[in-house]
């Protein structure tokens, strides 16, 4: 609970829900007859409607990117360090929109929603969704809000992929595209990590083929293991060494397999336990599959430069030196393709010890660079 909401916070915010009755045909060939998207806004839309910024979330993200839902909240939104008055995404200048994507588990239509055809939760029957599907649904939300063009579309990790897809799918609707700690497609290693996480969930006896809600259970063990695998990839070796080293939780070895002996074990189990209590297993499967499928250059014979030729936006690409999940080399692939396509691009490689999670952490150099780019965007 904050003793007082900070002056540079957007303050108390309330989610809003947009309902869509127009069917949305997905890349998998299936159609959502109707659906809803939950979102939050921060700042004010100007008279020209030229100052809107879209925030795209990563795998476990959601619509609550900044501020507090109540004065009793212990923590603000997941990107509060970057969104607010005077911050990198300055809400005194910008009207910021953040939503929970289709297939999510925080209020937008997803596997835990009721399937109108059966009256039961969708569960495993919810269709596989892609980054392109998300961008098309986000475009409909923009239409609903009266936003013809985004001043910027911004995202980190999977969110950065959505920002890139926006610049490709709706080039006339994006003035600036910011892709942070992202990649033009997943490497084989990243797909492998996702598959291990999925198998942890699928092999949990409580998964019940994805219809665990009807059984009144959750695949807690599988979700815990999936999250533990994920967290290993989000942190750098240096960050884990500095934070935990080989420190013991109780100053002694127990010579068994059931005790939590090392501090890093305790950390991973805590993260897995916390995550399994708030996230939906089917959503986790969907998000990782959307990551695996993202490959915009596939439609152009794997020519990323040709893929970006349609873009009209200016680009800012940021990476972090110790990120081995989406390494700086992957960001430079994006930059090289943009340059080959003769696009305006700013590239920032930021020295940060935290690994992939660095895009969520208020590193002064990162925030300064982020703010510097956003400040040059005319509204």
Swiss-Prot record:
Name of the top EC class for this enzyme: transferase
Protein name: Homoserine O-succinyltransferase
Keywords: Acyltransferase, Amino-acid biosynthesis, Cytoplasm, Methionine biosynthesis, Transferase
Catalytic activity: L-homoserine + succinyl-CoA = O-succinyl-L-homoserine + CoA
Residues given in the record as substrate binding sites: 227, 357
UniProt entry tagged with the keyword Amino-acid biosynthesis: yes
Entry-linked Pfam families: Abhydrolase_1 (PF00561)
GO molecular-function terms, A-Z: homoserine O-acetyltransferase activity; homoserine O-succinyltransferase activity
Keyword Acyltransferase listed: yes
Coiled-coil region: none
Gene Ontology BP term (one): methionine biosynthetic process
Taxonomy of the source species: Bacteria, Pseudomonadati, Pseudomonadota, Gammaproteobacteria, Pseudomonadales
Organism: Stutzerimonas stutzeri (strain A1501) (Pseudomonas stutzeri)
TM regions (residue ranges): none
Record-annotated site: Important for acyl-CoA specificity: 325
Entry function: Transfers a succinyl group from succinyl-CoA to L-homoserine, forming succinyl-L-homoserine.
Annotated ranges, domain AB hydrolase-1: 51-360
Top-level taxon of origin: Bacteria
Family designation: Belongs to the AB hydrolase superfamily. MetX family.
Protein's pathway: Amino-acid biosynthesis; L-methionine biosynthesis via de novo pathway; O-succinyl-L-homoserine from L-homoserine: step 1/1
This enzyme's EC code(s): 2.3.1.46
């Amino acid at each position: 609970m904050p003793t007082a909401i900070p002056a540079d916070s957007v303050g108390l915010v309330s989610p809003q829900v947009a309902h869509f009755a127009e069917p949305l045909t997905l890349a998998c060939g299936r159609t959502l007859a109707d659906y809803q998207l939950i979102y939050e806004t921060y700042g004010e839309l100007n008279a020209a409607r030229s100052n809107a910024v879209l925030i795209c979330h990563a795998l476990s993200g959601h619509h609550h990117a900044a501020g507090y839902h109540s004065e009793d909240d212990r923590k603000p939104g997941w990107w509060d360090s970057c969104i607010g008055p005077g911050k990198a995404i300055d809400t005194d200048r910008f009207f910021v929109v953040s939503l929970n994507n289709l297939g999510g588990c925080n209020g937008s239509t997803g596997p835990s929603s009721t399937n109108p055809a059966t009256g039961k939760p969708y569960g495993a029957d919810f269709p596989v969704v892609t980054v392109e599907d998300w961008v098309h649904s986000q475009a409909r939300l923009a239409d609903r809000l009266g936003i013809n063009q985004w001043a910027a579309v911004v995202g980190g990790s999977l969110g950065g992929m959505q920002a890139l897809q926006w610049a490709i799918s709706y080039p006339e609707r994006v003035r600036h595209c910011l892709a942070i700690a992202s990649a033009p497609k997943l490497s084989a290693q990243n797909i492998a990590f996702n598959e291990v996480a999925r198998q942890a969930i699928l092999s949990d006896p409580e998964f019940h083929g994805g219809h665990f809600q009807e059984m009144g259970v959750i695949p807690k063990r599988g979700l815990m293991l999936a999250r533990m695998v994920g967290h290993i990839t989000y942190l750098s070796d240096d960050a884990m060494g500095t934070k935990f080293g080989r420190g013991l939780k109780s100053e002694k070895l127990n010579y068994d397999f059931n005790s939590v002996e090392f501090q890093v074990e305790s950390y991973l189990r805590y993260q897995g336990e916390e995550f399994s209590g708030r996230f939906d297993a089917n959503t986790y499967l969907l998000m990782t599959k959307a990551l695996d499928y993202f490959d915009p250059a596939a439609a152009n014979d794997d020519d990323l430069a040709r893929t970006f030729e349609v873009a009209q936006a200016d680009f800012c690409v940021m990476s972090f030196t110790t990120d081995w999940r989406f390494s700086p080399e992957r960001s430079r692939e994006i930059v090289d393709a943009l340059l080959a396509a003769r696009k305006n691009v700013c590239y920032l490689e930021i020295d940060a010890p935290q690994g992939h999670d660095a895009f969520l952490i208020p590193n002064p150099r990162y925030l300064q660079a982020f703010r510097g780019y956003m400040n040059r965007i005319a509204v």
